[in-house]
Amino acid sequence: MRRAKGWVALSGTASAALLLITLVTLTSVRAASAPPDETRALWVLRSSLTSPASIDSLVASARTYGFNTLLAQVRGRGDAYYSSQLEPRAEDLQAQPASFDPLAHLLSTAHGAGLKVHAWVNINLVASASYLPVAPEHLVYAHPEWLMVPRALARDMATVEPASPAYLGRLARWTRSESGDIEGLYLSPLQPDAAAHLTAVVSDLVARYALDGVQLDYIRFPDERFDFSRYAVAAFRSDVAPGLPAEVRRELDAAAESDPLAYPNALPDEWSRFRRSQLSALVMRLRTAVRSRRPDAVVSAAVTPDVEDAYARRLQDWRTWLESGLIDAVCPMAYTPETPLFARQIASARGLAGTRAVWAGIGAFRLSPAQTVQHIQIARQQGADGFVLFSYDSMTGADRALDPYLAQVSRALFPPASGSK
């Protein structure tokens, strides 16, 4: 009993101390001021780009509530929410006349309202896990050999020609069965023709549209189990074999006769390095494509927030991208509702970014308006140059009609003049 009483007393003391710490922290957070030229952005899903009315509405909301930048998802799954000769028009636009160009309408309306527009481009992810595209010209049908293959299917897929319907069928079925972890079908940056296609898509975008920036998303591997496609493994073998001792090379060549994974299995560190370097090479190509067409456009990347996890599991070396100047801004997708973890992730990105910008990616879809405000203030406190809320669409449903989510965020954070420009 005495121990129980002591525990209660101690718990009360600890609770009081914790409350005091929390109040001090929150006071400090509230005091954080916005940096000069803060990027106040919204991620806009492609579902909000399907009509002139929906675009006009999102621009009006952004302007009213003090946001200054829209990251619009104009390439969702290897399709186009703009006029493209390289990829099929998005299925969601079937109800609109062929003359309707969502990106052109958005740029005209948003720039007229004083907002910046960045093309949010899903790079490697090109098809959903749950269904395949309708358009017969979609690249999953035109070039199934460009798709990443998981380790689990590597030996099986090595016996099937990519031109056979069975190739895509097996890959699609496996991906559907793993949809809890894998978003869909990915293009492989190890495929030179796939990398060239992606570069052409981005180059076409910035050449024909007055974009303020391009954000690279899904610029990663689904996880370390990919890409074990026949081309990728052969490319690795060609890259690494010349540097091996002759005896080791002979042994691996002999093993590869019966096991297509002989080289990756024997050289796992080199295999990861090779895949990582090829992804970084793609980032370099995309940056060059943007800057050669539109020198002032900002190149940003939405990244896995933990830099070590990104490096090891997603093969996404965004630390090097920053150090090498391949991106102008990094956007860690710090969607966690856990405030201490969010603070650590943004602080880490700020420490790694140097002179490059950090935009805190905030998972508003998982947070209350008050929590979103708190995370924005924490991002400011940690030295972020701006923030991006995911997503506009999740914050503007019918249940927000009485007191809109964005209105609550705006009242708490932005001076009145921000919403009246």
Describe the residue ranges of each PLM region.
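Boundary/entry segment of secreted carbohydrate-active catalytic domains
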Residues: 32-54, 303, 365
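Active-site-adjacent "subsite" loops/lids of carbohydrate-active enzymes
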Residues: 37-39, 49, 119, 124-208
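Substrate-binding cleft of secreted/luminal carbohydrate-active enzymes
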Residues: 326-344, 348-349, 356-421
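Substrate-binding cleft/loops of secretory-pathway carbohydrate-active enzymes
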Residues: 126-129, 134, 215, 224, ...
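Aromatic-lined carbohydrate-recognition surfaces of secreted/lumenal glycan-active proteins
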Residues: 116-122, 215-222, 264-314, 357-367
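Aromatic-lined carbohydrate-binding/catalytic grooves of carbohydrate-active enzymes
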Residues: 67-100
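Short, acidic/polar
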Residues: 48-63, 194-205, 309-324, 342, ...
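Catalytic domains of carbohydrate-active enzymes, especially glycoside hydrolases
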Residues: 54-80, 208-213, 326-329
